[in-house]
Amino acid sequence: FRPALIVRTKGTRL
């Protein structure tokens, strides 16, 4: 799992 992927998913969910 990459940290960048989680950050991008959180931004898209917002």
UniProtKB/Swiss-Prot annotation:
Keywords: Amidation, Amphibian defense peptide, Antibiotic, Antimicrobial, Secreted. One of its GO terms (cellular component) is extracellular region. Expressed by the skin glands. It is found in: Secreted. The modification Leucine amide is found at L14. Its main location: secreted. One of its GO terms (biological process) is defense response to bacterium. Has antimicrobial activity. Belongs to the frog skin active peptide (FSAP) family. Hyposin subfamily. This is Hyposin-H5. It comes from Pithecopus azureus. The lineage of its organism: Eukaryota, Metazoa, Chordata, Craniata, Vertebrata.
